Amino acid sequence: MILQPETRRSRFPRICVMILLGLLPMAIFAHQIHAKEEGAQAATTWIVIRHAERAGNADQLTDAGNRRAELLKQLGTAIRTTAIYSTDYQRTRETVTPLAEKTDVAIQIYSPGKLDWLQQAQSEHVGGVIVIVGHSNTTLPIVEALSGYQAKPIGHDEYDRLFLLQTGTAEPTCLELRYGESSAGAPSADAA
């Protein structure tokens, strides 16, 4: 195997992820401390993603999908995940299993066709950090139900979109990010 030296271009996504991993926990906890000082209800943080890469119609993750699941584990551990929700498909469960094992948080199964469980999740995990993994056609309805944010559709070859939401505040917020390696259908984070 020939090893190529890292170029500035190939290091950029890693640097962005490291910065995100470093700053995100501080921002979340600063907000929670501020809310407690004011006597307000603590905000609930949500990370909503599509499952990681799979090969064609296969249900298990590819090597790229497993790498993305490992990255999610790092992010979810850094921000102290308190709840994990997944549909009952192998690809969604495999996406969050490394995080569940690292944090010792059980994966709770939800039905992708219904959104009524979101209200119960919100009340059970007030002030917590909830990770939800869905599918290309179910992730955005969850994001919209929680925050009102309407994102462009997720392509069938897009796996790197991550939605960071906060609810329980005066105005729900949503930040759309990209994490890990760029998906085939996604614009590169380090594109010129």
Where are these regions (language model features)?
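Cytosolic-side transmembrane helix boundary signature
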Residues: I2-Q4
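Bacterial N-terminal signal peptides that target proteins for export
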Residues: E6-I19
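Bacterial N-terminal signal peptides
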Residues: M18-A27
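Active-site-proximal alpha-helix that buttresses catalytic centers in soluble enzyme cores
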Residues: F29-V126, T139-A192
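Noncatalytic modules at the cell exterior or secretory-pathway interfaces
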Residues: V129-V131
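Short beta-strand segments
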Residues: V133-H135
